[in-house]
Amino acid sequence: MKVIGVTRDDDGPQLLERERPSPDPGEALVRTLRVGVDGTDHEVLNGSHGGFPDGADHMILGHEAVGVVEEPNGTGLEAGQVVAPTVRRKPNGETNEYFRRGEPDMAPDGEYTERGIVGDHGFMAEYFTSPADFLVPVPKSVAEYGFLVEPLSITEKANEHAYATREPFDWRPDSACVLGNGSLGLLTLWMLDQEYDRTYCVGRRDRPDPTVDIIDEIGSTYVDSRETPVDELPGAYEAMDYIYEATGFAPHAFQTVKALDQNGVGVLLGIPEPWEFEVDGGSLHNEIVLHNKCLIGTVNSHVSHFEDAVETLQELPAWLLDDLVTTVTDPEHVEAAFEDGDDQIKAVVEFDSL
């Protein structure tokens, strides 16, 4: 079968031939439909994130996938059922407390592998196998965009955890801001716009730009951070009740605290490389304590977040899905899915269709 992988000798994505996998007991065989490409895939390729499976000379890429059950293998799934796979798996097949309680997304380093990212092959192949417990049903009506379930699940978890910090009191947020106008940021912006009176999105793009067009269509305010840095949002626009960071730009973590309103919460999802810079720690501490602000980090997601994401996917407007997916390519031309450019928002590798 055809797979897209990265080898220890090559930097870019490679079209490889590998044997079709056979499912173990408790696993199903899935025929892949589409796999999305995101920033993490680029980080895996350049070696700044993730790692190869033990002893392997290559790793199959891809963690945003949708497929069709080819062989249920006695799992209780049905042949022809559309599913989206979660990402984290038990390390070396051995369970631990995080997997036993259904919270693999809360496991520390070394207590998990991640398909297509850390220590385990991904889904960018014509077929893959997975334990049935990690396959989430997706309605056929949205199968074409089922690869978005994984990124949507990341936001479902981030929002859940951020809002949980405000549950002890009567929090009445009106304004939300997304830092980053990539595909994840734009999906999140639409989600937040359904909840908040006013929404903003911070980016670094000149008009005309397709991502800014989406921001405008959603009805949000675009903020160019070259003109208005994040910590100047309160003066230029307003202090924010909720800030969702999806840039990986390290200063944004600290600028978020300044940009939050009284009782506000910020959630960090970007993964920056090491970067030393000066921070006024006293003022930062003061802002958090005296104004009841909160800053949290979150990564990955689990089955319940995938299930919530499936519901959200069914609510996304057709125009947003059409505008968001800018490249659909086959495995033979996978390089197109990894090209960076101002017109590229969300790229997809298509292996098959329903």
From Swiss-Prot:
InterPro entries: ADH-like_N, Glc_1-DH_arc, Glu_dehyd_C, GroES-like_sf, NAD(P)-bd_dom_sf. Keywords: Carbohydrate metabolism, Metal-binding, NAD, NADP, Nucleotide-binding, Oxidoreductase, Zinc. Pfam families: ADH_N, Glu_dehyd_C. Zn(2+) binds at D38, H63, E64, E150. The keyword DNA-binding does not apply. NADP(+) binds at N181, G182, S183, L184, R204, R205, L269, G270, I271, T298, V299, N300. This is Glucose 1-dehydrogenase. It comes from Haloarcula marismortui (strain ATCC 43049 / DSM 3752 / JCM 8966 / VKM B-1809) (Halobacterium marismortui). The gene is gdh.
